[in-house]
């Protein structure tokens, strides 16, 4: 894939908060995590038919249509947010979209819960538990399994820490943070603005940092491997270093967001998802 070089002039005035505020250790039993997750504590032969094979050889193989065109930087309309303003907020109306664009400006509906949530077959920092944060959407979960398998082959130890989180759970965390630190607290995302609710995000850590979610993870062998390889499996580091003014969130080397094939273009050009959607054309 050829690389493009772009110059961006970005003027966004958003507050910087940590996007991955997960349940602190005194949360309810069905969503607790015993690991030390500092950023979020501020708080699962028959023989071939030769005749059919001959017929199939005469027919061109059907290729699955890929939504993202890297040559034209274009996407079909259905991969863009459909927005409806509700009480002064921009609410996403097509949240099942794999490229759903969630941030401070575009919120998920309060009643949205993905219908295809599954537990990926990967290592978790708290062991295998059937609790909400173990889940991801099915496509993202399969990609996470492939990523973890590739890491394991290179003796890179990864552990999933926190995936899906409901709107109501995010509201609880937000209320707790405001009660503790006041309305100007900068640690817990507002309900609706967390990518975890989409089922497309997973926080990942390793034993080298005691399975905590800390910026020092970028300096570990595991964190570096993740940064350099996640895009091969459809994931991006959603909240990048030196992109805080664009994303509105602090640097989170642990936060993976599944975007499918667009991940390669985003990675190779070091784009934030905000920048990607500024550039990509709607068709």
Regions found by a protein language model. Give the residues of each.
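Positively charged n-region of N-terminal signal peptides that target proteins for export
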Residues: 1-6
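C-terminal motif of bacterial Sec signal peptides marking the signal peptidase cleavage site
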Residues: 16-19
């Amino acid at each position: 894939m050829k690389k493009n070089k772009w110059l961006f002039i970005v003027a966004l005035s958003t507050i910087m908060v940590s996007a991955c505020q997960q349940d602190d250790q005194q949360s309810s039993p069905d969503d607790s995590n015993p690991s030390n997750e500092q950023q979020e504590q501020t708080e699962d032969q028959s023989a071939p038919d030769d005749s059919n094979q001959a017929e199939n050889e005469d027919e061109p193989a059907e290729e699955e249509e890929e939504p993202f065109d890297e040559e034209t930087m274009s996407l079909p309309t259905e991969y863009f947010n459909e927005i409806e303003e509700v009480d002064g907020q921009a609410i996403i109306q097509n949240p099942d979209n794999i490229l759903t664009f969630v941030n401070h400006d575009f919120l998920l509906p309060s009643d949205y819960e993905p219908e295809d949530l599954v537990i990926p077959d990967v290592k978790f920092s708290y062991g295998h538990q059937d609790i909400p944060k173990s889940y991801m959407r099915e496509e993202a979960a399969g990609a996470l399994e492939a990523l973890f398998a590739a890491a394991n082959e290179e003796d890179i130890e990864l552990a999933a820490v926190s995936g899906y989180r409901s709107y109501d759970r995010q509201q609880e965390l937000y209320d707790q943070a405001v009660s503790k630190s006041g309305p100007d607290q900068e640690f817990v995302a507002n309900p609706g603005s967390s990518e975890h609710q989409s089922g497309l995000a997973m926080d990942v850590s390793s034993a080298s940092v005691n399975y905590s979610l800390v910026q020092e993870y970028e300096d570990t062998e595991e964190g570096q491997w993740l940064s350099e390889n996640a895009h091969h499996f459809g994931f991006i580091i959603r909240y990048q270093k030196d992109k805080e003014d664009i994303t509105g969130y602090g640097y989170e080397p642990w936060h993976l967001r599944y975007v499918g094939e667009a991940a390669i273009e985003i990675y190779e050009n070091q784009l934030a998802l905000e920048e990607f959607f500024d550039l990509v054309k709607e068709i």
